């Protein structure tokens, strides 16, 4: 009987020890899994206020000027690794395209919708500085849509392909929120809204500085 009791106690101690080890293993796995998930917050959503400053263009006896304005830019970025990310953005501004032609000056008030995508190169920086600089390049389209306040009849909505380049920096507020300052340059052909009388056949450039907030998840 004594031998059986000892054997039972040993077996009971063995199972208790195994149970403790199992619980400890599960807790350890849970901790490491949570840490891994926290480190793998690869998606970002950004909302930024922007400026929109377009260079004057000349061609075929026509001078074109776009009024300076402001708007917004929203984006989604997916971090592929510590070096590169892919992003897609939508932006909106409203300005007036002014044309100096032989018969005078005409203007078209325009909603400009921006659809772009690209690759982001993340420049390494010390973690203690909380600043994460980056460079970007890509392409997309600017869609120019005349409003009802346009002074020229017959102007149609027109899309222009655009090359995008730029850079910026994020300042980390926490694991999930950052402040962002960015510059984007847009290179594209000046719009003429399908009217040959307004065609400068010129390439123009828009500077788009911006600042906003980023949510990482």
Q: What are the roles of these predicted feature ranges?
A:
Residues 1-41:
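Cleavable N-terminal export/targeting peptides
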Residues 37-79, 86, 139, 143-146, ...:
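Short glycine/proline- and aromatic-enriched beta-strand/turn motifs that initiate or cap beta-hairpins
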Residues 41, 66-72, 111-115, 131, ...:
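Residues that define the transmembrane beta-barrel architecture of outer-membrane proteins
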Residues 43, 83-86, 127, 173-179:
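Repeated loop/turn-to-beta-strand initiation elements of outer-membrane beta-barrel proteins
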Residues 45-51, 88-92, 135-141, 169, ...:
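Transmembrane beta-barrel strands of outer-membrane/channel proteins
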Residues 56-63, 98-104, 145-153, 191-198:
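Outer-membrane beta-barrel translocator domains and adjoining extracellular loop/strand segments
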Residues 75-150, 206-217:
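Gram-negative (and chloroplast) outer-membrane scaffold detector with strong preference
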Residues 90, 95-99, 171-217:
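Predominantly the C-terminal beta-signal and adjacent terminal strand-loop region
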């Amino acid at each position: 009987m004594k031998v059986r009791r000892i054997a039972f106690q040993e077996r009971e101690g063995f199972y208790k020890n195994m149970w403790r080890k199992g619980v400890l293993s599960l807790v350890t796995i849970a901790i490491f899994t949570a840490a891994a998930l926290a480190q793998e917050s690869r998606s970002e959503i950004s909302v930024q206020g922007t400026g929109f400053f377009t260079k004057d263009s000349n061609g075929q006896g026509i001078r074109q000027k776009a009024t300076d304005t402001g708007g917004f830019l929203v984006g989604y970025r997916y971090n592929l690794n510590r070096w590169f990310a892919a992003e897609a953005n939508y932006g909106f501004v409203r300005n007036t395209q002014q044309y100096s032609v032989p018969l005078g000056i005409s203007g078209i008030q325009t909603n400009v919708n921006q659809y772009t995508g690209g690759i982001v190169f993340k420049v390494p920086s010390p973690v203690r500085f909380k600043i994460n600089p980056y460079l970007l390049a890509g392409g997309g389209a600017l869609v120019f849509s005349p409003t009802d306040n346009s002074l020229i009849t017959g102007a149609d909505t027109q899309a222009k392909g655009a090359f995008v380049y730029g850079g910026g920096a994020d300042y980390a507020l926490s694991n999930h929120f950052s402040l962002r300052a960015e510059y984007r340059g847009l290179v594209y052909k000046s719009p003429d809204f399908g009217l040959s009388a307004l065609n400068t056949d010129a390439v123009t450039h828009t500077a788009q500085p911006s600042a906003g907030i980023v949510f990482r998840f």
